[in-house]
């Protein structure tokens, strides 16, 4: 009797729980039908289907349709998980969990500004911009020479003269390759001096008087000389190896020299620029004699120095020689400032001196 009553109660519980599903007049809808009907009748509302388990029917599943606008435990859980991941990524990237932070996986693909020339055509160079171009002052005095008067001046002068002999022996009259080698060396002092002045400005919490910018401009100008002559002279493999060796030695030597005596370092660069003027003068003589072909100027040189479209290699050598004369003046001026017992910041730097 007790077993019969217990069985009846269990059966009643099963009927109450399963009745709405087993004895409902509503037809079960498949996933395909649910998606099709929802799209046809309610094009603005997207439907999806999920599987649900009956509470007391072991292993039985039924399909039902819901709209995406309705909240379900599964969707709320997914949304919370994504929110947590975004906050975690943003916190790792920004160093905190500030509200509104957005995690970025990569910054690749920053779009540059579109730049055009004065005539409206597209600017094709990425290594320099139109506002960095200029017309070289070729009327500058090329024959000026600083007479060495002090012991350091004489050391600087004869150091540069001693470097000329192996250069003449190696390159002889191959002035294109000679110019390439010269520019790989001449581009180092401005960068070293600007870097050391930059660190000094940070260390002392003081301005540089514009000399950081002036020296870095010099280094960039010399680098553009190299990029230009690379279009004219194609260096051989052993010349490239020589460039690596010479640049490595000269960079470290000039770095130490500038730390020990800036006035000596600038004086030596001034004499080095005087030798560069001499080399480019000889280059022009060979062009005028016809020993070197006066080929059309590279496109990069025409845009950088604002040369006419029909400019030739001779025009390029002329403007490069004028640049070297300006660098000569800047470095002798910097050395004179130090000789007077003053710092570079006390005298205005010749920024934009071309």
UniProtKB/Swiss-Prot annotation:
It is found in: Mitochondrion inner membrane. Keywords: Disulfide bond, Electron transport, Iron, Membrane, Metal-binding, Mitochondrion, Mitochondrion inner membrane, Oxidoreductase, Respiratory chain, Transit peptide, Transmembrane, Transmembrane helix, Transport. Disruption phenotype: No visible phenotype under normal growth conditions. Decreased operating efficiency of photosystem II and an enhanced activity of cyclic electron transport around photosystem I. Altered photosynthetic carbon metabolism when grown under high CO(2) concentrations. Residues 72-86 have a biased composition (Basic and acidic residues). The keyword Transmembrane helix applies. Induction: Up-regulated by antimycin A, low-nitrogen and salt stresses, high light, H(2)O(2), ethylene, paraquat, rotenone, salicylic acid, malonate,erythromycin and cold treatments. Its main location: mitochondrion. Its cofactor is Fe cation. CDD domains: AOX. It holds the Pfam family AOX. The keyword Signal does not apply. The chain crosses the membrane at residues 179-199, 241-261. Changing residue 127 to A/L/Q: Loss of activity and stimulation by pyruvate. Residues 1-62 form a transit peptide. Expressed in roots, stems, cotyledons, leaves and flowers. High expression in sepals. Gene3D superfamilies: Alternative oxidase. Binds 2 iron ions per subunit. Homodimer; disulfide-linked. Cys-127 is involved in the sulfhydryl/disulfide regulation system, but is not required for subunit dimerization. Presence of a positive charge at this residue 127 confers activity while an uncharged substitution creates an inactive enzyme. Catalyzes the cyanide-resistant oxidation of ubiquinol and the reduction of molecular oxygen to water, but does not translocate protons and consequently is not linked to oxidative phosphorylation. Increases respiration when the cytochrome respiratory pathway is restricted, or in response to low temperatures. This is Ubiquinol oxidase 1a, mitochondrial. It comes from Arabidopsis thaliana. The gene is AOX1A.
